[in-house]
């Protein structure tokens, strides 16, 4: 997984695209998943990244609509969904992936609604992990989800049509990325 520079450095999207292309050239068998910001809603930097033809395009929505501004004050929930729409419009064969972090104050029905929103924009792959407060400056953790709840969310995601759902307390964006990629490419589009 290659993480793209943050949203404050949008002018670097072509440089990042060059890195992805060089990675493909140097190691053609190595799969490249790119983790990108929302590009503040701009399509041009997304298009630039997609010209490198990454194997998976990942943009983490991170939270539910109800607490989105608390979690990502500079982001926009609908803008994140629109990024997925634009990705599929510009490069329909590139699998898309997103991630949700739980335990920040949402309830499980809101997580399911976020999953539905992601499927509605044809997101292929999903990760769901437990929020762990990294410092006192970050939002408080509301609660730990149980293993049964993570399994329930995984099952819901599979029934919604996600090609792969990784759901568990330690799951993060890069969690078994190779398995997720295989799941996305083995199934007919």
At which residue positions do the language-model features occur?
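A short, flexible beta-alpha/helix-coil linker loop
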Residues: 3-4, 64-66, 133-135
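Auxiliary Fe-S-binding modules of radical SAM enzymes
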Residues: 22-29, 51-52, 75-95, 100-189
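Alpha/beta enzyme core
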Residues: 26, 30, 43-58, 62-69, ...
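Internal alpha/beta domain cores that form substrate/cofactor-binding pockets in large enzymes
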Residues: 33-37, 66-78, 90-91
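Short, surface-exposed acidic/glycine-rich loop or hinge patches that mediate macromolecular interfaces
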Residues: 37-40, 105
């Amino acid at each position: 997984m290659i993480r793209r520079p943050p949203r404050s450095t949008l002018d670097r999207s072509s440089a990042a695209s060059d890195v992805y292309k060089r990675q493909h050239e140097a190691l053609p068998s190595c799969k490249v998943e790119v983790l990108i910001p929302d590009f503040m809603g701009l399509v041009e930097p997304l298009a630039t990244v997609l010209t490198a033809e990454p194997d998976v395009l990942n943009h983490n929505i991170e939270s539910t609509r109800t607490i989105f501004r608390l979690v990502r004050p500079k982001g926009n929930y609908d803008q994140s969904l629109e990024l997925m729409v634009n990705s599929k419009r510009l490069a329909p064969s590139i699998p898309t992936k997103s991630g949700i972090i739980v335990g920040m104050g949402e309830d499980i029905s809101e997580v399911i609604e976020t999953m539905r929103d992601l499927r509605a924009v044809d997101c292929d792959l999903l990760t769901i992990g437990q929020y762990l407060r990294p410092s006192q400056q970050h939002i408080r953790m509301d609660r730990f989800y149980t293993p049964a709840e993570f399994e329930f969310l995984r099952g819901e995601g599979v029934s919604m049509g996600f090609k792969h759902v990784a759901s568990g307390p330690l799951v993060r964006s890069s969690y078994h990325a190779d398995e997720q990629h295989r799941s996305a490419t083995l199934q007919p589009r």
